């Protein structure tokens, strides 16, 4: 979070605080409605992020800044306060992220350890696991080939994060342009096959977060139907 964004967010929360005493029925102009909407949205975000701010003092700062009154803190003092706030917030977010990554890794390892002994599960040296649902008889793709597939991706708790069914059409891509777990599995699948593939975190997105339901070090499960293979020229 850059300093300007931090300052803008605090100002927005102050707007929300200042408007809190105003009856909602008095929001008669577009300016009032916009001001309140921005303030309320930022206020909710601050609350969700656990940022502890005194709304009354914040509103006082906004009022002084807008009126041109003598500020209680100097510009240098405010710069130092905001800089510390930014550093503390980043440290907190980093600690939360690392904790989540460790938890996801432990859960994923435990899941894969239990899953590997289930009937029909094949475990590869890389740690990738798969189960053949329907065995196809077509060609197997190479790394440079293009495939068309239908798939559903879930977390180990069953949360669906992606699906071609939702998109309404199959996906087409080069085998080498997907996560390592997919690249490895696809090269073993004959066209026409349907597999359930269990992808360890290090063969998926690893310790980074890609947004949405997929957090750091998530083990992912895919049901993949390989429709066709187009050989590279």
Curated annotation (Swiss-Prot):
PROSITE patterns: FKBP_PPIASE. The keyword Signal applies. The gene is mip. Belongs to the FKBP-type PPIase family. InterPro entries: INFPOTNTIATR, PPIase_dom_sf, PPIase_FKBP_dom, PPIase_FKBP_N, PPIase_FKBP_N_sf. It is an enzyme of class 5 (isomerase). Keywords: Cell outer membrane, Isomerase, Membrane, Rotamase, Signal, Virulence. Residues 1-20 form the signal peptide. GO terms for biological process: protein folding. Strongly inhibited by FK506 but is completely resistant to cyclosporin A. Residues 144-233 form the PPIase FKBP-type domain. It catalyses: [protein]-peptidylproline (omega=180) = [protein]-peptidylproline (omega=0). Its EC number is 5.2.1.8. It comes from the Bacteria. One of its GO terms (cellular component) is cell outer membrane. This is Outer membrane protein MIP. It is found in: Cell outer membrane. PANTHER family: 39 KDA FK506-BINDING NUCLEAR PROTEIN, FKBP-TYPE PEPTIDYL-PROLYL CIS-TRANS ISOMERASE FKPA. Essential virulence factor associated with macrophage infectivity. Exhibits PPIase activity. One of its GO terms (molecular function) is peptidyl-prolyl cis-trans isomerase activity.
């Amino acid at each position: 979070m850059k300093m300007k964004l931090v300052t803008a967010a605090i100002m927005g929360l102050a707007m929300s605080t200042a408007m809190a005493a105003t009856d909602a029925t008095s929001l008669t102009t577009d300016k009032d409605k916009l001001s309140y909407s921005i303030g309320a949205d930022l206020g909710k975000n601050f609350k969700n992020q656990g940022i502890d701010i005194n709304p009354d003092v914040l509103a006082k700062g906004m009022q002084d800044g807008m009126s041109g009154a003598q500020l209680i803190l100097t510009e240098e003092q405010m710069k130092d306060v905001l800089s510390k706030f930014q550093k503390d917030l980043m440290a907190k977010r980093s600690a939360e992220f690392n904790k989540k990554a460790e938890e996801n890794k432990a859960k994923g390892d435990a899941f894969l350890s239990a899953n590997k002994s289930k009937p029909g599960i094949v475990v590869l040296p890389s740690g990738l696991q798969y189960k053949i649902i329907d065995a196809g008889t077509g060609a197997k793709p190479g790394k440079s080939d293009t495939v068309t597939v239908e798939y559903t991706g879930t977390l180990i708790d069953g949360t669906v994060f992606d699906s071609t069914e939702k998109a309404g059409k199959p996906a087409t891509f080069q085998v080498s342009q997907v996560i390592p777990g997919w690249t490895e599995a696809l090269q073993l699948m004959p066209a026409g096959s349907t597999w359930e593939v269990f992808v360890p975190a290090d063969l998926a997105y690893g310790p980074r977060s890609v947004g949405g339901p997929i957090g750091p070090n998530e083990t992912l499960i895919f049901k993949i139907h390989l429709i066709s293979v187009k050989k590279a020229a």
